[in-house]
Amino acid sequence: MADEATRAAFMEIQASMIELTGKLKQVQNQMRNKEGDRKRAFLTLEELRPLPEETNTYKSIGRTFVLEPKTVLEGEQEQKLKDSEAAVASLQTSKEYLEKQVAEVENNLRELLQQEPGIAQQIMSMSM
C-alpha cells in the first residue's frame, strides 16, 4: 500500500518536473528571440541616427519597400526596442519563478528518495 503511494508520488513529481522543464525551456527560447529583436532594433537605430534628415529611407513590408521619413522609422525602431526590453523583463520574472519551482520539485524528489531508498532501485530497474 505504502509502496503504491510512494510510486504514485514519484510519478506525480516526475510529471511536474517534465512540465516545468518544458515551460522553462519555452521561456528561455522566447527570451532569446526577444533579445534578438532588441539587438536588431538597437543596431537599426544606431545606423539611422547619424543619417541626415533628408535621407530617403525605406521600410520593408513583405517583398516590397515603402519610402518612409527617417523620423517614422526611428520611432518604430524605438518602440520595438522598448517593447522587446519590456518583454525580456517580463520573461525574466517568469524564468525566475519557474527556476524556483524546478528547485522545489527537485527537493521534493530528493526527500522522497531519501525516505524510500528502495524506490530508487525500482526506478532504475524500470528504466533498463
From Swiss-Prot:
Task: Please indicate if the UniProt record lists Cytoplasm as a keyword.
Answer: yes
* Inducers of expression: Accumulates in response to cold.
Enumerate the UniProt keywords alphabetically: Chaperone, Coiled coil, Cytoplasm, Nucleus
Q: Which InterPro entries match?
A: PFD_beta-like, Prefoldin
> What Gene Ontology terms describe what this protein does at the molecular function level?
unfolded protein binding
* Gene Ontology terms describing biological process: cellular response to gibberellin stimulus; cortical microtubule organization; mRNA processing; protein folding; response to cold
Pfam families from the entry?
Answer: Prefoldin_2 (PF01920)
**How is this protein annotated for GO cellular component?**
cytosol; mitochondrion; nucleus; prefoldin complex
Q: Which residues form a coiled coil?
A: 17-37, 81-115
The listed locations are: Cytoplasm; Nucleus
Record's CDD domains?
Prefoldin_1
Alphabetized SUPFAM superfamilies for the sequence: Prefoldin
Q: Which family is this sequence assigned to?
A: Belongs to the prefoldin subunit beta family.
Q: What does this protein do?
A: Binds specifically to cytosolic chaperonin (c-CPN) and transfers target proteins to it. Binds to nascent polypeptide chain and promotes folding in an environment in which there are many competing pathways for nonnative proteins. Together with other chaperonins, contribute to the regulation of gene expression by modulating the spliceosome function on pre-mRNA splicing post-transcriptionally by acting as a co-chaperone of Hsp90 to control levels of LSM8. Required for microtubules (MTs) organization and dynamicity.
Subunit comment for this entry? Heterohexamer of two PFD-alpha type and four PFD-beta type subunits forming prefoldin co-chaperone complex. Interacts with LSM8, a specific subunit of the LSM2-8 complex, which is a core component of the spliceosome.
What protein is this chain from? Answer: Prefoldin subunit 1
Species the sequence originates in = Arabidopsis thaliana
Gene that encodes the chain: PFD1
